[in-house]
Amino acid sequence: MQIYMVGGAVRDRLLGRPVHDRDWVVVGATPEQMRAQGYLPVGRDFPVFLHPATREEYALARTERKSGRGYRGFVVHSAPEVTLQEDLSRRDLTINAIATSADASGAGCLIDPHHGARDIAARVLRHVSTAFREDPVRILRVARFAARLPDFTVAPETLQLMREMVAHGETDHLVAERVWQELARGLMAEKPSRMFEVLRACGALERLLPEVERLWGVPQSAEHHPEIDTGAHLLLVLDMAARLQAPLAVRFACLAHDLGKGSTPADMLPRHIGHETRGAELLKHLAERLRVPADCRATADKVAREHGHIHCSNALSAAALVRLLERCDALRLPQRFADILLACECDARGRLGFAESAYPQRPRLTAALAAAQSVHSSAIAAQAAARGLAGPQVGALIRQARVAAVAQWLASQ
């Protein structure tokens, strides 16, 4: 039995990045031998075990053979005679196909049959072999790695292979959960814009997220958007979200906030009247198709519908501010409202020349919410009940009190 550290841990060590998770491959062993040594089997599709002490993953060396279309169309073969070189050859990118005989201390020699260390030094994402084309998820992984390692470029031959896979319809067979998983990881990467640039370059964005692809080539008012192109604006917004270390729900909201601009009638351009409502409907279909988690979907819906009003909120009256808070469900879900405001700040600063600009709407609306929250609604409801009032009448009294509290706060500014 021989054990090697493989994949991301080796790659990140060569890049000088922190190593958070280590993966290991075991050559020359059977599942029975692994269990006999105390390893806990956890793999469903192929033999993976957890180390009895470290809980790190140890996978038996394996090969994969294409048996059908899409992500799940594979036959996996794992046996003691499968070599380390065979296991490395099934991997997607050369930078991920490096092993080391290192122990936990990190000492040891590299086993690098596909010259991944050379590609790391050259900052290139390159496929290991033409077997890359057997798994369409690898298109998403390359795009995600481009976002995680933004100083890397995709090798021309790899990009061409990705284009051919898209043209042959391989991305049409991806399962929604896997698309969302890779999309979410790309959104949370260092430079999310790179993911979408790579997906556009190979044609996959049009097949997977046509609502997003349609934003390119759509002009906006140069007065408000010096970058003009809506797609260019989207990339700036996504990278601003990464810069501000926004959570996933905010980054997805940034991705989806302007979808309605892709369907603006040509005779209306560069104005986009009503794009908020159109965008919310497109978002609904996109989120259902990809099975986006409920928290991401809800935050994105509010941002799509309300970002224009939030941008203009500095001029709103107390009554209008309270109505905005109610539409955003801010009093019931203040943390989600904070996420909505952060997404709007990313939108405002994700414009050419505005990256360092202040966004006073965010602290202003946060303070307005605090003023509205200072109203003791339960006390008002009890007083109203004592007067024989109920239902909408009680709600109206609470709203009046919140408007008064916000008005008092406005007067103090």
From Swiss-Prot:
The gene is cca. Monomer. Can also form homodimers and oligomers. SUPFAM superfamilies: Nucleotidyltransferase (SSF81301), Poly A polymerase C-terminal region-like (SSF81891). It catalyses: a tRNA precursor + 2 CTP + ATP = a tRNA with a 3' CCA end + 3 diphosphate; a tRNA with a 3' CCA end + 2 CTP + ATP = a tRNA with a 3' CCACCA end + 3 diphosphate. CDD domains: HDc (cd00077), NT_ClassII-CCAase (cd05398). ATP binds at G8, R11, R91, R141, R144. Magnesium is required for nucleotidyltransferase activity. Nickel for phosphatase activity. Its EC number is 2.7.7.72, 3.1.3.-, 3.1.4.-. GO terms for biological process: RNA repair; tRNA 3'-terminal CCA addition. InterPro entries: CCA_bact, HD/PDEase_dom, HD_domain, NT_sf, PolA_pol_head_dom, PolyA_RNA-bd, tRNA_CCA-adding_enzyme. HAMAP family: CCA_bact_type1. Comprises two domains: an N-terminal domain containing the nucleotidyltransferase activity and a C-terminal HD domain associated with both phosphodiesterase and phosphatase activities. This is Multifunctional CCA protein.
